[in-house]
Every structure is written in structure tokens, then in C-alpha cells.
């Protein structure tokens, strides 16, 4: 039970203490009080602990509850009830009044005698409270106060007397001060913690030993939720319960949040005067005014602090230049008329404060810091000057003119010390005000006195002008000579938002450097560019000698910083260029803490990018412990390539250390890619420099990829970096020396890691939405432009930079409009087989190869698609041609290995094979190439360098590499959860694939017959007999732009289960038995032995015919062959070979996934060997019934009748109904209501009014997908239905569109085909009056098609009439002749 208070339950809501009135019982008073009432703030009231000891002995003896207790006097009753408390020891005083001590029978006898007197006192206090008017009654339901009776379970509970005291105290206070008025406790809804303090404070003050001191004289009251109500409660409690000491008048009546800047300024200036000024000001009370609504009262409150202060001399009056627009004109004039005491300059012995100790949030404090910095750090023979650099636009012309006139009056010829220099006045709307301010600056500036003036290039518009004036006045008062020992401290400092304020702080540091001669001495520039006064330039030039002497000390200070601090920002570098050093002997490379930053504007970024090269060459830096500890951002590593290498041994180390960062902007990335491309041409580099350059290009491509994925407009930034990446990686391998590769520090594993990362980043960029949108056809796109070489050129390209250049008609602004596939994806698959495609063109006739390059794009693709059908035998016959391998170099091994690493599942680390990358590469190369090293050395995991060898595997290796990258991209896109088999490192398995075995069988492999070259390596693969929808059809239908069904979970069902071999029959589980010896691997329906031979136990005759074809691309992957074969059969199989027009101009390819595009691109441009699919089994014809057992079905007799045109027509055809099937092209009323109910229950969900005008009439596409997917239809079918009904293409469906879509799903589930276009009758029947409208339309069509029968009868009658007329004339003629 919650707290019970002697207030009628009817009016309990008006009492602020009773927050739990919903749990009150019907009894008005109860002697037991719940635990939550006393322990609301994790502790009981201090009033009820050791209460007997806390009372003075005189008070305790003088109170007699039986004589002095007046039932009509609640105060006396309270004292009597309080005096009857039994004395408790410290051990018995519990923090919880409801302790278990009161519940024991042993302690019940202690309070037998005291409970009688306590009950009488409690009743007396309750009756007194009732008669004093504390209780209120209502007319509807009268509730009287009953005499409290103790509980039966606690008959002698002493808490009833405690409660009587509290009730009496409340009753007394409410009787005298009208507690239920608007200004009382109930009007503000005071929290329970405030009420607890109100009841604790009076008693504590009443019985305190020093009654003259008030505990509420402290002006700094903590921020409460409702400050005014709590202060009122405290003041009221002080007046009521002070029985012995007269309470002084409270100094703070009603504290609120001051919303007016003028009153805040007055209170702040007064508080500062009281704390830090003279004793007269300290003795004055602190005035904290309430919320002012009238300007007159505001003026009256603000005037006392100025009247209390001593009169200031007229020579020290400084105007306040920026006052806010005040709401009340009278108060504004009163505030403006108050003078502020000026600050005399402090001595130079005061230490320099740190103005950036906190983040500045208020712009006013910025100006105060600038004003103070000029006074704190003056030159010894000079005096400081206060500069107000920019007046903001004053909205009120009258107040502006008043301020300007006041400043003109104060700035006379005798006030030369606080001269005001304003170099950049803001443009003012009022011309009169502008002229006045300009005249003020001209009058105040005196060129005869050489004094440094702090210049501000542009201060932002300060939001709170009143607070700015307050801080300015505060800073001026602090700098008073009487309080010169006080250092400046601004508690409201925040983050600087404007670079101009940073520059002002830099000028302050300049003054300190001139004075102390130990600060940053490297600022100098020409007089035309340096934005400081001439006097300061003269002073700066005088200190150059002392600055040069301190350069050695500065260099020693830099050695203490970690290497990570060398990543200096572009703005810092720009600031060094802007304020360069005085002499060339001064070191540039100071720590970031010592460098002063300018604003991160576009101009400074551009200057930093342009000058970082010149600065980085001439500046030495310290040597870090690890060069790779420096953050390898794109701009940092791109700056490495900008430095020309004259001494590779020394400069390459400096390049890594000297990584001054370029800004991450469009210009910097573009310059980084361009400069990297220029610097890598025609330069001989050392291995270390090339490694750094490859890292630089890789990092540049990574960050360019991140930018290009965010916005379409940044694509032109990423393109140069990607082009340079492929160029540097190709040239790195060729330029490295054999001696460098022999060392473990410069091994190929670093390059392999680089290329694998480049391939992964390239494929990631290709999968973004930027590259999925349809491209426009580009006429100038040819293979010659794409590959950058001529097909008939067999020699390698020159040393010039080879890059994947875009077509000639390509423009950076129109990247999305060309018919160019993503360059990143091309770099992953095409660069791996680029050299092979050039060599393979020479296999055919040179004339056909030369003519093929001159053909347009479509014909080239058709030629390559025709060449893709060549078998393995045709390739093996041409393998002995020597001119094919004459120009093969080692530059192609790096992208090839990268493609292989990607193909082994490097991207999905959690599902990758258990062996490492080097082992996987060794295994892959050993199984794919069968290439014999020329130096007869075994391959190892540490050195994976593959020497060239003139064998067929060189060409076949590059072809497989291109397809391996495309296959892996497709497998990751289609089957992300493919279970890859982790081959254990078994001796038998590794021995069969190791280089030692290949070296031993060198002669056998070279002189073996042609069909057996790849026999021991390639496994025998069986193709499952499953006929599914081709992947291209599925993706072509579902992956259109704006498709909400892309990558739906139901796509896995269309492709089959990915956790088991897909040709295993249903119910058969896959059991992979990896034996310890590694001899065989059991896949439940086939066996894969250690040598790679795969034997299918249930192979049919058609599958046995595939044994001769042993050149499967999928056999080189660590994934089980049967899984990948089925997954990628539709992508790479010959049964789905898209036409050249599809690759050239169709939007299906560009709209499909990047994996399908990569596979088809590699398939068409780089021909690969594919297996012929098994012949499809013909359908068995249904056996005819035996003539001996069943009767032959008799045909119905057709009735013919004679027509007018001489032909016969069957009566059966006439009796057939010519009406269409009603349910197929019409939505009946019952189904329409069912669909409409589903639409009404989900409309408007996930839609906002800001995007759509009527969201309640629409249904979101995500909701549509969730609803339609419950039907169980394939995702491709649902996507097609969505395209049929989506007429507006806004991502939402209306009522009619949703109903028609539901109708089409039902028709598909019934087995009907989907229409190419939704008939008009279906759209018409989807409306609420559709049934009636459809029937009317049907009736209209029926009447229109009805033949005019009466015309036929008329014609027939005419024919009969002519016939009868002819007969009658003939008979007449015969009769005449007979006569």
C-alpha cells in the first residue's frame, strides 16, 4: 500500500504529495505508512531516526501531552505527539521504519504504555487538522475524517505519533498559507523529492544550534525540474516551522530560466562584481530576477548593479558595439545607456591562457576570447587594442543608430589607447549605418602608433547577441587592475564552427611566439598575401634570427611524438604554405599539435594538393619503427608516387615516411590517379619502390571505390585510380628483379595479397547499384579500344603505361550513359586472360584475325561465341605451335594468381577451405597447369613464383583463370551458402598434386598422347538429369530496375538446395567421409579418390558418354564438382548461349546481376571449353489400349445442312458457345471483396505523408512482397506479376493494381499462363461496380456482333419471288404453245 495522508480521497489529486492516489484504500487515515513513502530516495527520513535525541532537552520536558495539548491547536497537538516518542538506541534505530523489529512479539510489550498516549495525541492532531480547515469537502460525495485507529497487527506501533506530527505540520502550513491556491505546492506539481526537502528543512533549521544563519542564502541553486515551485515551497516551509528564530526574507523569490538576454546580462555582471570586485560590491545581495514580462520592471532590476558600483571615469568608457534587438524599447535604451568599465592592459608576466580548453558552442565567447587575447599578449612597449571586426546586420535601425552615435561620442581624440580597427565590416543594409561605422574605423585608427591589431577575416553571425555582450563585459571586468591576478576562464567554450575564429587564435599564438621566442617561428609570406597589419610584419621580421636559433629545439620536440602523428591534414599543410618559414634552415615537419590549422575550405584543400609535392621533396622526416604503421589512406599513398625516384635506396624509405595527406576531395583523388599514372611511365624502380607504388594504387582504388559506391557523380573520380591500379600491378611484376624476389621480405606473397585484394575490391564495386542500370549503346566501343592493343600484334606492349582506357567517346560526366560494362569487373576477369586472348587470336588465320578487329562489336562477339564451341581436341592440336609462347612473359602470372585465389573462396573467409592461400594456390596451379618448372625446383608455399614454360597449360591456364573469377562471382551471387569441402592436408592427396610428382613424371606428360594430357588431373563429372528454368531467364525477369523481389529467399528453392549435392535423390543424405589417409571421399552416390578421379556409382548410359570430355572448368575448384556444376550449368552451359545482340545492346544483361554479366562476358570474349549436355530423354508415348479389352471410341456423327453459298456447315459447331471463359478474364464480386479486404488491412503501412499525398490509398512494395510471397509462387513469377500491374512505377500499388495482382497469382496457381498484358476486362472488373459494368459491356458487344437475320430472309424471299415469277411465265408460255 502506498502512502496514506489525512486528506479526503475525493480531493487527493490536488495534493502534490499524493502521487499514488490510485492505490489508496478507503480508510482516510492509517497508522501504518508504506515503505515507499519513507524510502522514496533510497533512505528514510532523517526526521524519524533518533528523534528523541535530536530534540533539545528543554523542549522535551516542557511539553506535556496531557495538559498542554489543545485539540483545537494543531501545533500544540503536533508538539505533544512528537514529545511522546519513546527513546531509541542507535542499535534499535533502523533505516526502515517497517523493520522486522516491530513485528516480533518480544518488542510488543515495550510500546504498550506509550501507545495510549500516542493514540490520544494522534487523534488530537487529526481533529485539530480537521477543524483548522485543512480538509475539503465536495458536494457530490462527502468524506469525513475518522479518528485513526491502529492496526490489529501492530497495536502498539509508534509510527502513529510520528505521522500525527507530520499531519499537524502540514495542516498548520496549509491553514495559514492557503495550500490549494494557484501559487501553492499543488499548482506546480512538485516531485516527491522536493516535498521531502521542504519537510526536512524547517525542522532542521528550527532545532539547529545557529538560528541566525539561513541555509538558503546560497544563490547557486542546482537546476531542478521546476525551480520556481521548489523555491516557493522552501520559502513557505521556512516561514511556517521556524518556531524560535525569525526567518529572514528570502533573497530569491521565483527563479526561472531567463529567456531574455538583457536580464541575463544584468545578473551575470552583478554576480561577477559581487564575487571579484571591491568589498562594497561583495556585500551587496545577489539579485536573481524572475521572468520579466514588462520592460519597465526589467529596467528597474538592471539598474541596481550599476548604481551600487562606483562612478567610472569618462576616459575609460568603451561602447558595447553589438546589442541584440530587444523586445522592449525602454529596456533596450536603459541597457545601452549603462557604461561598462574598461580593462587596462595586464602585465606580460601573466601566463598565456589556453583559449581552446573547451569546445565553444556560443559564438559570443569567441569574440570575447579575441578581445581578451589582444589584451593578454601585447608587445612590451605597446598597448593592446580591442578590435571588433564585424558588425552583424542589425534588424532594428533605431537601436543601430543609437549604438553608433554612442560609439562616436565615446571615441574622441583623447581615447587613443583602446582604438578600434575594423578591416572587414560586414555589408549593411542601411547605407547610413554603414557610412557611420566606416567613419568610426577611420577616426579611431591611427597610423602613427605602431601597434599590432588582431585582424579577423570574417566572423560568422552570432546567434545570441545578448550572451555575446555579456561575455564581452565579463572579460572587460575581469581584466580590471584591481583583480589583475585573476586568470581568464570561460566556462561556456565550445567547438569552433568557423575557420575565421581559428585564424584569430593563430594570430594570438603569433603574438605569444614574438614575446616568448620559443613558439612556432615558421610564419612568413609576402606582404601582399599575409593578412596582417604592416606593423606586425615588421615585428615578425625582427624575430627571424631568434626563430632560427630555436629550430633545433623544435626538432627535438618532434622526436617524442609517435609515427601515427605524421598524418598531417591538408589544412595543416595549407597553413604551412600560407605562413611559410622565415629561413630555409627551419624544419617543416612539426607535430600536429604544433601545427596551426586553417579552415577546411576548398581553397586550402586545393592549395594543399598542389603544393604537397614540392614540400615533401625538400623536407626530411624522422624514421618510424615500422613503415606500415603510417595510415595508408588513398591520398597518402598516392603522394608517394608523385615523388620522382632518383635514389631508390634512400628515397623509397623517405616516401613512406613522408606521407603528408591530401584532402579526401574530388580534386585530390583525381590528381592522385593522374599523377600516379604519369609517374609510373618510363621510370626504372627498385623492388621496394614498386611495392610501395602497388600499395599506393591499391589503396587509391579502395577509396575511389568507396566514393563511387556512394554517388553517381563520383564515378569519374574512381576511374583514373582503377585504371592506374591495373597498370601498376601489371608493371610491378615485370620490373622486379630475381634477386629481390629471392628475399623473403620482397616475396611474391605480398604481391599476391595485393592482387587478390584488388580483384575483390573490383568485384565489390561491380555489384553496386550504380552499374546495374541499363546503359545506352555506344557506337565507338570496340575491342581494340577496350584491350588497348591490336589482335595481330604478338609482341608485348611497350613500356608505356597500359591502362584500361575507356572508349574514345567516353566522357567522365556521362559514365552511366555508355554501353560499357564496369571496369572494375573487367579488371577482375579480363586482366587475368588479357594476354591469352591476344595470343589465342593468332591461332586462327592472320587475315581473319585482322579482319575481326575491324568488325563492329556485335560481329566480334558472334565470332568469339562461335569460337567458344571449339572442343579440347582442337586446342590440343594447336598446342605445339611455338610462336604462341614466344612472347609470353611473367606479367600475366599476377592477375592469373589473383583470379585463382578469388576462385578458391578467398572472399568468404568463414566458408573457405581450411588450407591457406598459398597452399590453395599451389594446389590449384598443380591441378590446373601440370606445368614443369624450368629450374627443376619444387614449389613451396613461401615462394610461389611460376616460371614460364612452353606448354599448352600456359594458354589453358589463363583461360581457366578468367572463367574461375567469373564462376566464383556467379557462385557467390547465386549460392552464398554453398558448403565448401575442406580438404584435409593428407599425404596421398598432396603427393599427387605436388610439384615433385610432376617433375618425376615430366617425360610421361610431355610425350603422352594428346587426349591423355589432362586425364590424371581432371575429374570425371556426371551431369544431373534435372531440367530447371535457366538462370538467365530467372534473373532477367527479377532483376529489373526497382525490383523488390531481387535476391528473395525463395530463389534458393528455384535453384535447389545448396547444402547437399543437387543430383542426389530426395531422402538421401550426403555423407562426406574424409578418411585420415585421404584416399577416398564418399559423396553417397559417387567416389572422389585422391588423384582427383570422380566415379559415379549410378551413371546412366548418357552420362557415360561424357567421359571423353574432361576439360571442365569446375574441376579446379575446391567446392564439390556436382554442386557447382548444377549451380552454374545455366550460366556457362551451351544450352543457354545468349545472342550477340543481347550482350551488345540488350538491357537484360545490364539489368541482371554482375555475376551473370561477368560469366557471359568471359564466355563470349574468352572462349572456354564446355561440355555438351546429355541428350534429353524423349517423352514416352502413352500406350494405346488393347483392342481386345476396350472398345474403340466412336466419333460423334456431325450433322450438316445446306447453306446458301453451296457449302455445308456442321450443326455441332453452331451449337458451341462463342463466349470466353468468365473467371479467366473477369474478377467476380466475391473474389474482388476478398482481395479488397486484404488491401484495406495493409494500406498505408510504412508510408509517410511527406512522400505521398494520399498514403492511405496505397500499399508499399515491401508489404506487397511479404503478402504475395505467402502464396508459394516462385519469385520470378511474382516479379513478373508485379511488373504487369505496376503502371505508375512509384514503388507503391493502388487498390486496383493490388487486386489485379492477387487475381493473377490465383490464376497462375490454378495452372493458367500469365498474359503478356492485363486485359481491359480485368481492370474493369477490379472496380467496385465492375460486375455491372462488365456485363453491360458484354451485352453491348453481343448486340454489335449479332447478324441481321431479317436481311437474309428478305434476300431469300426475293430469290423465291424471282423463281416463282419465272415458273409462272414458263407455265403461261407452255399453255400458250399448247393452245
Curated annotation (Swiss-Prot):
Stated name of the protein: Increased rDNA silencing protein 4 homolog
Lineage per the UniProt record: Eukaryota, Fungi, Dikarya, Ascomycota, Taphrinomycotina
Biased composition (Low complexity): 541-555
One MF annotation (Gene Ontology) recorded for this entry: calcium ion binding
EF-hand domain sequence ranges: 1273-1308
Family: Belongs to the IRS4 family.
PROSITE patterns in UniProt: EF_HAND_2, EH
Gene3D superfamilies (alphabetical): EF-hand
Protein origin, superkingdom: Eukaryota
SMART domains: EH
CDD domains: EH
InterPro entries referenced in this protein's UniProt entry, alphabetically: EF-hand-dom_pair, EF_hand_dom, EH_dom
Residue intervals of the EH domain: 1240-1329
Comp. bias intervals (Basic residues): 770-780
Cellular component, GO annotation: cell division site; cell tip; cytoplasm; cytosol; mitotic spindle; mitotic spindle pole body; nucleus; phagophore assembly site
Function as written in the Swiss-Prot or TrEMBL entry: Positive regulator of phosphatidylinositol 4,5-bisphosphate turnover and negatively regulates signaling through the cell integrity pathway. Involved in rDNA silencing.
Ranges of compositional bias, category Polar residues: 262-287, 562-573
Chain intervals for the UniProt region annotation (Disordered): 1-25, 138-159, 240-314, 337-370, 534-573, 768-816, 1047-1110, 1168-1208
Basic and acidic residues composition bias: residue spans: 250-259
Amino acid at each position: 500500500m502506498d502512502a496514506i495522508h489525512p486528506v479526503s480521497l475525493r480531493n487527493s489529486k490536488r495534493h502534490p504529495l499524493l502521487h499514488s492516489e490510485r492505490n489508496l484504500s478507503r480508510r482516510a487515515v492509517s497508522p501504518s505508512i508504506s515503505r515507499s513513502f519513507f524510502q522514496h530516495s533510497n533512505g528514510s527520513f532523517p526526521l524519524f531516526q533518533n528523534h528523541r535525541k535530536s530534540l533539545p532537552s528543554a523542549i522535551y520536558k516542557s511539553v506535556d501531552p496531557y495538559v498542554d495539548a489543545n485539540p483545537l491547536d494543531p501545533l500544540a497537538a503536533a508538539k505533544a505527539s512528537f514529545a511522546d516518542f519513546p527513546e531509541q538506541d542507535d542499535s534499535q534505530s533502523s533505516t526502515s521504519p517497517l523493520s522486522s523489529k516491530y513485528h516480533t512479539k518480544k518488542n510488543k510489550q515495550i510500546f504498550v504504555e506509550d501507545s495510549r498516549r500516542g493514540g490520544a495525541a494522534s487523534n488530537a492532531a487529526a481533529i485539530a487538522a480537521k477543524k483548522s480547515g485543512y480538509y475539503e469537502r465536495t458536494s457530490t460525495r462527502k468524506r469525513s475524517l475518522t479518528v485513526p485507529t491502529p492496526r490489529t497487527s501492530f497495536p502498539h506501533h509508534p509510527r502513529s505519533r510520528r505521522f500525527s506530527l507530520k499531519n499537524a505540520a502540514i495542516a498548520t502550513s496549509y491553514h495559514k498559507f492557503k495550500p490549494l491556491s494557484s501559487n501553492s505546492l499543488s499548482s506546480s506539481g512538485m516531485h516527491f523529492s522536493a516535498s521531502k526537502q521542504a519537510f526536512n528543512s524547517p525542522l532542521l533549521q528550527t532545532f539547529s544550534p545557529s538560528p541566525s544563519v539561513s541555509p538558503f542564502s546560497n544563490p547557486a541553486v542546482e537546476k531542478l525540474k521546476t525551480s520556481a515551485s521548489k523555491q516557493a515551497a522552501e520559502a513557505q516551509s521556512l516561514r511556517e516551522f521556524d518556531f524560535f528564530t525569525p526567518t529572514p526574507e528570502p533573497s530569491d523569490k521565483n527563479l526561472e530560466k531567463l529567456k531574455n538576454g538583457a536580464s541575463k546580462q544584468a545578473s551575470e555582471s552583478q554576480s561577477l562584481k559581487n564575487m571579484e570586485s571591491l568589498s562594497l560590491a561583495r556585500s551587496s545581495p545577489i539579485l536573481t530576477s524572475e521572468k520579466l514580462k514588462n520592460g519597465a520592471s526589467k529596467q528597474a532590476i538592471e539598474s541596481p548593479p550599476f548604481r551600487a558600483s562606483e562612478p567610472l571615469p569618462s576616459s575609460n568608457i568603451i561602447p558595447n558595439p553589438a546589442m541584440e534587438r530587444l523586445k522592449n524599447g525602454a529596456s533596450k535604451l536603459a541597457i545601452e545607456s549603462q557604461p561598462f568599465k574598461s580593462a587596462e592592459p595586464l602585465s606580460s608576466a601573466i601566463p598565456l591562457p589556453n583559449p581552446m580548453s573547451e569546445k565553444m558552442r556560443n559564438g559570443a565567447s569567441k569574440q570575447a576570447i579575441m578581445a581578451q587575447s589582444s589584451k593578454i599578449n601585447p608587445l612590451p612597449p605597446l598597448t593592446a587594442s580591442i578590435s571588433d571586426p564585424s558588425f552583424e546586420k542589425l534588424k532594428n535601425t533605431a537601436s543601430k543608430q543609437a549604438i553608433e552615435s554612442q560609439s562616436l561620442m565615446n571615441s574622441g581624440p583623447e581615447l587613443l589607447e583602446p582604438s578600434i580597427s575594423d578591416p572587414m565590416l560586414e555589408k549593411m543594409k542601411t547605407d547610413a549605418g554603414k557610412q557611420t561605422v566606416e567613419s568610426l574605423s577611420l577616426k579611431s585608427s591611427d597610423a602613427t602608433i605602431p601597434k599590432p591589431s588582431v585582424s579577423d577575416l570574417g566572423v560568422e553571425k552570432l546567434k545570441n547577441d545578448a550572451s555575446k555582450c555579456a561575455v564581452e563585459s565579463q572579460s572587460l571586468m575581469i581584466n580590471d587592475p584591481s583583480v589583475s591576478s585573476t586568470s581568464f576562464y570561460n566556462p561556456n567554450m565550445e567547438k569552433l564552427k568557423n575557420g575565421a575564429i581559428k585564424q584569430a587564435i593563430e594570430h594570438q599564438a603569433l603574438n605569444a611566439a614574438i614575446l616568448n621566442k620559443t613558439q612556432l617561428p615558421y610564419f612568413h609570406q609576402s606582404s601582399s598575401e599575409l593578412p596582417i597589419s604592416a606593423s606586425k610584419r615588421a615585428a615578425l621580421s625582427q624575430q627571424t634570427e631568434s626563430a632560427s636559433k630555436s629550430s633545433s629545439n623544435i626538432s627535438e620536440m618532434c622526436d617524442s611524438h609517435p609515427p601515427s602523428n605524421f598524418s598531417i591534414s591538408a589544412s595543416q599543410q595549407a597553413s604551412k604554405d600560407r605562413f611559410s618559414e622565415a629561413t630555409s634552415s627551419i624544419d617543416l615537419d612539426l607535430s600536429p599539435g604544433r601545427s596551426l590549422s586553417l579552415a577546411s575550405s576548398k581553397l586550402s584543400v586545393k592549395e594543399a594538393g598542389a603544393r604537397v609535392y614540392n614540400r615533401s621533396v625538400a623536407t626530411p622526416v624522422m624514421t618510424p619503427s615500422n613503415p606500415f604503421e603510417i595510415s595508408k589512406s588513398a591520398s597518402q599513398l598516392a603522394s608517394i608516387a608523385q615523388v620522382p625516384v632518383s635514389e631508390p635506396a634512400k628515397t623509397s624509405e623517405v616516401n613512406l615516411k613522408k606521407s603528408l595527406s591530401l584532402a579526401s576531395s574530388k580534386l585530390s583523388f583525381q590528381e592522385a590517379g593522374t599523377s600516379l599514372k604519369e609517374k609510373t611511365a618510363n621510370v626504372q624502380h627498385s623492388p621496394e619502390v614498386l611495392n610501395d607504388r602497388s600499395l599506393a594504387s591499391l589503396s587509391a582504388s579502395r577509396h575511389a571505390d568507396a566514393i563511387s559506391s556512394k554517388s553517381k557523380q563520383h564515378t569519374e573520380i574512381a576511374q583514373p585510380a582503377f585504371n592506374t591500379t591495373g597498370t601498376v600491378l601489371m608493371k610491378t611484376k615485370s620490373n622486379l628483379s630475381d634477386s629481390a624476389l629471392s628475399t623473403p621480405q620482397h616475396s611474391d606473397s605480398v604481391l599476391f595479397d595485393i592482387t587478390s585484394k584488388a580483384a575483390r575490391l573490383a568485384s565489390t564495386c561491380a555489384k553496386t547499384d550504380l552499374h546495374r542500370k541499363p546503359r545506352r549503346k555506344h557506337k565507338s566501343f570496340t575491342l581494340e579500344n577496350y584491350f588497348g592493343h591490336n589482335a595481330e600484334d604478338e609482341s608485348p606492349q611497350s613500356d608505356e603505361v597500359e591502362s584500361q582506357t575507356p572508349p574514345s567517346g567516353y566522357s567522365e560526366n556521362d559514365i552511366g550513359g555508355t554501353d560499357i560494362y564496369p571496369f572494375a569487373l573487367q579488371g577482375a576477369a579480363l586482366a587475368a586472360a588479357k594476354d591469352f586472348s591476344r595470343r589465342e587470336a593468332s591461332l586462327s588465320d592472320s587475315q581473319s584475325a585482322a579482319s575481326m578487329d575491324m568488325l563492329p562489336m556485335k560481329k566480334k562477339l558472334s565470332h568469339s561465341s562461335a569460337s567458344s564451341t571449339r572442343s579440347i581436341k582442337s586446342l590440343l592440336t594447336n598446342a605445339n605451335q611455338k610462336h604462341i609462347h614466344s612472347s609470353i612473359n611473367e606479367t600475366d602470372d599476377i592477375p592469373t594468381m589473383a583470379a585463382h585465389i578469388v576462385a578458391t573462396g578467398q572472399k568468404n573467409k568463414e566458408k573457405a577451405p581450411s588450407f591457406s592461400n598459398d597452399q590453395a594456390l599451389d594446389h590449384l596451379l598443380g591441378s590446373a597447369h601440370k606445368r614443369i618448372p624450368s629450374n627443376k625446383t619444387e614449389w613451396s608455399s613461401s615462394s610461389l613464383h611460376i616460371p614460364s614454360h612452353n606448354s599448352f597449360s600456359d594458354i589453358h591456364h589463363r583461360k581457366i583463370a578468367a572463367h574461375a573469377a567469373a564462376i566464383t562471382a556467379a557462385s557467390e551471387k547465386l549460392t552464398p551458402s554453398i558448403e565448401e569441402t575442406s580438404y584435409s592436408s593428407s599425404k596421398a592427396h598432396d603427393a599427387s598434386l605436388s610439384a615433385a610428382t610432376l617433375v618425376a613424371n615430366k617425360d610421361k606428360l610431355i610425350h603422352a598422347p594428346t587426349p591423355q594430357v589432362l586425364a590424371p588431373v581432371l575429374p570425371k563429372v556426371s551431369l544431373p538429369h534435372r531440367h530447371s528454368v535457366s538462370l538467365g531467364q530467372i534473373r532477367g525477369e527479377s532483376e529489373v530496375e526497382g525490383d523488390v523481389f531481387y535476391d528473395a529467399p525463395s530463389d534458393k528453392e528455384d535453384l535447389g538446395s545448396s547444402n547437399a549435392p543437387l543430383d542426389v535423390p530426395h531422402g538421401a543424405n550426403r555423407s562426406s567421409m574424409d578418411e585420415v589417409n585421404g584416399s577416398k571421399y564418399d559423396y553417397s552416390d559417387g567416389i572422389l579418390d585422391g588423384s582427383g578421379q570422380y566415379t559415379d556409382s549410378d551413371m546412366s548410359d548418357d552420362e557415360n558418354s561424357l567421359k571423353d570430355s574432361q576439360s571442365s572448368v569446375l574441376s579446379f575448384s575446391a567446392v564439390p564438382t556436382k554442386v557447382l556444376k548444377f549451380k552454374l550449368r545455366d550460366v556457362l552451359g551451351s544450352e543457354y548461349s545468349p545472342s550477340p545482340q543481347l550482350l551488345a545492346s540488350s538491357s537484360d544483361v545490364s539489368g541482371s546481376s554482375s555475376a551473370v554479366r561477368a560469366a557471359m562476358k568471359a564466355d563470349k570474349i574468352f572462349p572456354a571449353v564446355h561440355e555438351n549436355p546429355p541428350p534429353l530423354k524423349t517423352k514416352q508415348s502413352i500406350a494405346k489400349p488393347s483392342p481386345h479389352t476396350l472398345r474403340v471410341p466412336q466419333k460423334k456423327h456431325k450433322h450438316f445442312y445446306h447453306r446458301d453459298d453451296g457449302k455445308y456447315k456442321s450443326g455441332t459447331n453452331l451449337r458451341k458457345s462463342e463466349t470466353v471463359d468468365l473467371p479467366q478474364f473477369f474478377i467476380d464480386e466475391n473474389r474482388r471483396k476478398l482481395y479488397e479486404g486484404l488491401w484495406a488491412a495493409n494500406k498505408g503501412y510504412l508510408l509517410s505523408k511527406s512522400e505521398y499525398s494520399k498514403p492511405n490509398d496505397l500499399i508499399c512494395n515491401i508489404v506487397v512482397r511479404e503478402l504475395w510471397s505467402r502464396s508459394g509462387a516462385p519469385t520470378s513469377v511474382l516479379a513478373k506479376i508485379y511488373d504487369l500491374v505496376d503502371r505508375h512505377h512509384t514503388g507503391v500499388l493502388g487498390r486496383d493494381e493490388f487486386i489485379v495482382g492477387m487475381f493473377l497469382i490465383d490464376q497462375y496457381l490454378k495452372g493458367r499462363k500469365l498474359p503478356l498484358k492485363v486485359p481491359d476486362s480485368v481492370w474493369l472488373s477490379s472496380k467496385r461496380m465492375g460486375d455491372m459494368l462488365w456485363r453491360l459491356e458484354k451485352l453491348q458487344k453481343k448486340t454489335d456482333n449479332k447478324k441481321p437475320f431479317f436481311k437474309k430472309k428478305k434476300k431469300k424471299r426475293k430469290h423465291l419471288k424471282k423463281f416463282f415469277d419465272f415458273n409462272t411465265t414458263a407455265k403461261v408460255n407452255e399453255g400458250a404453245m399448247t393452245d
